[in-house]
UniProtKB/Swiss-Prot annotation:
Family, as annotated: Belongs to the GHMP kinase family. IspE subfamily.
Origin species: Clostridium tetani (strain Massachusetts / E88)
E.C. number(s) listed in UniProt: 2.7.1.148
SUPFAM superfamilies (UniProt xref): GHMP Kinase, C-terminal domain, Ribosomal protein S5 domain 2-like
Catalyzed chemical reaction(s): 4-CDP-2-C-methyl-D-erythritol + ATP = 4-CDP-2-C-methyl-D-erythritol 2-phosphate + ADP + H(+)
Entry annotation: catalytic residues: 8, 133
Name the UniProt record assigns to this protein: 4-diphosphocytidyl-2-C-methyl-D-erythritol kinase
């Protein structure tokens, strides 16, 4: 069985509180894009085995896809094992939920094999035990996410808008970013209602005017080259550019495919990891 595991971007990310256990309460507008890993599942006798074309991801119980298979087996008392092969295309440590999407793909695949009557809501309850982005990745599409990311409200589809993504040659520790933002004074929060309104109207220009990621307060201050990437995307015709998740990937929206391709060529001459994609 092959399952596509799609990347996500944050059209907005806001922090609205902190739980007693230290997890931050968020308001996010999330969007699936046409950049994906391919997760191959093969049922075997007993154990869980994981392999990949990317040597930089863990191939043991640290991998979220492994954790997903293990939790699914334990939850439903599945005796069979599974061989997982991850064909990795989404950059790692990028703010694109690659690991969470792989985990969601494993859950969806095992659901289809062993528990076909299990709905996404029930599957998401398992997913949140693996990671906060996993429930959203089970649903995909355009969504407003609250809590730590597990409360999901589907929004009108925001499809076929082109974007260019640039992943710098370093990763970002999500935990460190959130601990640092606790020490910052947040003066301006994203206008989430206006962002949701722009999606309802399928208005890309209005979205780009309002989209905002509160974590940029930390990451762009520490990594000035991310500011440079944003400026370059805007210089090459982007209607709006922003960091996704805790970074470091920066994306920019474009009105037409041609303008996105033009920007892609220019950015590719400067940076190693550049992608052209569209919302789906």
């Amino acid at each position: 069985m092959k399952i596509k595991a799609y990347a996500k971007i944050n059209l907005s990310l806001d922090i609205v509180g902190v739980r007693e256990d230290g997890y931050h309460l968020l308001e996010m507008v999330m969007q699936t894009i046409d950049l994906y890993d391919v997760v191959h599942l093969n049922i075997k006798d007993k154990d869980i085995e994981i392999n990949s074309n990317n040597c930089n991801i863990p191939l043991d119980n640290r991998n979220l896809a492994y954790k997903a298979a293990k939790l699914f087996k334990e939850t439903f008392n599945i005796k069979e094992g599974v061989e997982i092969y991850i064909e990795k295309n989404i950059p790692i440590e990028a703010g694109l939920a690659g690991g969470s999407s792989d985990a969601a793909a494993v859950l969806r695949g095992l659901r289809d094999i062993f528990m076909p009557n299990l709905n996404n809501k029930e599957l998401a309850k398992i997913g949140v035990r693996i990671g906060a982005d996993v429930p959203y990745c089970i649903y995909g599409g355009t969504a407003f996410c609250e809590g730590i990311g597990e409360k999901i409200t589907k929004l009108n589809p925001f499809k076929d808008h082109y974007l260019v993504l640039v992943k710098p040659d370093f990763g970002i520790c999500t935990k460190e970013t959130y601990s640092k933002i606790d020490k910052k004074e947040i003066i301006k929060h994203p206008d989430t209602k206006e962002i949701i309104k722009s999606i309802g109207e399928n208005n890309l220009k209005l979205l780009c005017k309002n989209m905002e990621n509160i974590l940029e307060i930390v990451t762009l201050e520490e990594r000035s080259n991310l500011k440079d990437i944003k400026k370059e995307l805007l210089q090459y015709g982007s209607l709006g550019a922003q960091m996704t998740g805790s970074g470091p990937t920066i994306f920019g929206f474009f009105p037409y495919r041609d303008s996105a391709e033009n920007c892609y060529r220019k950015m590719k001459s400067k940076y190693n990891e550049v992608y052209i994609s569209k919302t789906i």
